[in-house]
Amino acid sequence: MKKLIVIVLLAVVGGGLIVDSGYIYAKAELAQEFIEDAWQETLEKAKAGIEDKVKPWSWADTWPVARMQMAKHDIDLYVLNGTTGNALAFGPGYMNGSSQPGYPGAMVIGGHRDTHFSFLKDVKIGEQFSMQTKTGEVFNYRIISMDIVDVTRDKLVVDGFDDSLVKLVTCYPFDAVNPGGPQRYVVTAGLGL
């Protein structure tokens, strides 16, 4: 009888761990459908001359501000406003105050290394991706550098650039056991280079 109780308890705990570990992945993927709908509505409103923050669901504290596509890695992501934990659970996030596609300066986009930005470990210098703005305009960027930055010592530079850059930022190393360490992997891309 004790053996049966131990087996049942282990099965319940194991099942709970499996469900819990899959939760963030499922949430991130399912939310993409709602976010895609919000993005389409954002584009339609922009065509009509209406600037609006179209939230993917009524209680959302974020909304799509750009679309990033990278065919080589089969990437099609909607960039959300803000880099809070809530926003990053659903997609990569735009760092408020950084630049916009097509404008001088650096647009900074953060994402989790184990979900939306897991592909960054496979990108190479020279690869291209596109950024679509909420007005529908598309800008093509080429990767020019990949760096590892220690946030306890170094500051991510976003100002003072004459060129239009996009900086994709995620935690590093990609296979770290503990999340949120001090290192960041920064992929920098330049407009049309």
Model-predicted segments: where are they?
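Solvent-exposed, non-transmembrane regions of membrane-associated and secreted proteins
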Residues: L4-L193
